């Protein structure tokens, strides 16, 4: 198999709560797969548009020259969806920065951040740990005076 020059690829991760999605972005023809399945096959169906937001915002032509493969682990269904969309967005920005030009990368970044900051910046909120003296992080056990 003849090689077509050096392999142009970037590896980026997206996170939400405990879900982590790792995206490999390389030169290709517009393929986006998550755990080996196309974006349209990902459940839950109600959050399908959340996954497609980066593609719809930036247009298919920006994704036409790249293949993105995402592996996602941990968390629940919703957290995984948010991790996937973040990793796809970050992968495209990183690819454009490394292999295309700085101006188009800045344009992409500005569009994404103006729409929704969590597409590029991780949400730092985490679950607060349980403390003694109560059933949860803040709730206390009921107390009686007699």
UniProtKB/Swiss-Prot annotation:
GO terms for cellular component: cytoplasm; cytosol; cytosolic ribosome; cytosolic small ribosomal subunit; extracellular exosome; focal adhesion; membrane; nucleolus. Gene3D superfamilies: 3.30.230.10. It is found in: Cytoplasm; Nucleus, Nucleolus. GO terms for molecular function: RNA binding; structural constituent of ribosome. Its main location: cytoplasm. The modification N6-acetyllysine is found at residue 60. Keywords: Acetylation, Cytoplasm, Nucleus, Phosphoprotein, Ribonucleoprotein, Ribosomal protein. GO terms for biological process: cellular response to leukemia inhibitory factor; cytoplasmic translation; maturation of SSU-rRNA from tricistronic rRNA transcript (SSU-rRNA, 5.8S rRNA, LSU-rRNA); ribosomal small subunit biogenesis; rRNA processing; translation. The modification Phosphoserine is found at residue 3. SUPFAM superfamilies: Ribosomal protein S5 domain 2-like (SSF54211). Component of the small ribosomal subunit. The ribosome is a large ribonucleoprotein complex responsible for the synthesis of proteins in the cell. Part of the small subunit (SSU) processome, first precursor of the small eukaryotic ribosomal subunit. During the assembly of the SSU processome in the nucleolus, many ribosome biogenesis factors, an RNA chaperone and ribosomal proteins associate with the nascent pre-rRNA and work in concert to generate RNA folding, modifications, rearrangements and cleavage as well as targeted degradation of pre-ribosomal RNA by the RNA exosome. Belongs to the universal ribosomal protein uS9 family. Component of the small ribosomal subunit. Part of the small subunit (SSU) processome, composed of more than 70 proteins and the RNA chaperone small nucleolar RNA (snoRNA) U3. This is Small ribosomal subunit protein uS9. The lineage of its organism: Eukaryota, Metazoa, Chordata, Craniata, Vertebrata.
């Amino acid at each position: 198999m003849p090689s077509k020059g050096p392999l142009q690829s970037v590896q980026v991760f997206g996170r939400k709560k405990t879900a982590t999605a790792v995206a490999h972005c390389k030169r290709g023809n517009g393929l986006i797969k998550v755990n080996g399945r196309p974006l349209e096959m990902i459940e839950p169906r109600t959050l399908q548009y959340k996954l497609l937001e980066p593609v719809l915002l930036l247009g298919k032509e920006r994704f036409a020259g790249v293949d993105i493969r995402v592996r996602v682990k941990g968390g629940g269904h919703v957290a995984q969806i948010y991790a996937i969309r973040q990793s796809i967005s970050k992968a495209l920005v990183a690819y454009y920065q490394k292999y295309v030009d700085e101006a188009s990368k800045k344009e992409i970044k500005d569009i994404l951040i103006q729409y929704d900051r969590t597409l590029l910046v991780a949400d730092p909120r985490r679950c607060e740990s349980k403390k003694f003296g109560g059933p949860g992080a803040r709730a206390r056990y009921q107390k009686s005076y007699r």
